[in-house]
Regions:
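Glyoxalase I/VOC metalloenzyme domain signal
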Residues: 1-6, 11-33, 43-98, 116-132
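Residue-level "edge-of-site" marker
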Residues: 35, 105
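Glycine-rich, proline-tolerant flexible connector loops at the mouths of alpha/beta enzymes
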Residues: 38-40
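Short, small/polar residue-rich loop motifs at catalytic or cofactor-binding pockets
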Residues: 107-110
Length: 132
């Protein structure tokens, strides 16, 4: 049997701040998770999204340090409509999260916007333009 892709893991500096951001994107994360060193959430697609604090990673990899420079990954969230892309981008940036690129109509047929989570990871918001 071949390995199965199952989890996308994020290493975070502040668990509560990171989970607050992802709750705004509709993820159902319990409030008590804010104080945990590891959080694991099953997504409707069957994949899991996991968060670990830097201290958790360093507990088994003592010399590990967070990567420097730009984001190394991007998580993309599909929105129901182009208007929802605009609305979600506005809500996140008004709440103080970094907007990396304001919504635009991409040549590949989607309304697209780019934000950053509290750890600087890229988070894409998109919707098909044909659904507008």
């Amino acid at each position: 049997m071949a390995p199965t892709f199952d989890v996308i893991g994020l290493v975070v500096a502040d668990m509560a701040a990171s989970l607050a951001f992802y709750r705004r994107l509709g993820l159902d994360l319990p409030p008590e998770a804010d104080n945990e060193p590891h959080v694991d959430l099953a997504l409707p697609s069957g994949l899991r999204l996991a968060w670990d604090t830097v201290a958790t990673i360093q507990s088994f990899e003592p010399d590990w340090t967070p990567p420097q420079g730009g984001p190394r990954i991007a998580l993309a969230f599909r929105c129901d409509s182009p208007a929802e892309v605009d609305r979600t981008y506005a809500e996140l940036t008004e709440a103080g999260y970094e907007g990396h690129r304001k919504p635009w109509d991409a040549f590949w047929g989607q309304r697209y916007a780019l934000v950053r989570d509290p750890d600087g990871n890229g988070v894409d918001l998109f919707a098909s333009l044909s659904e507008s």
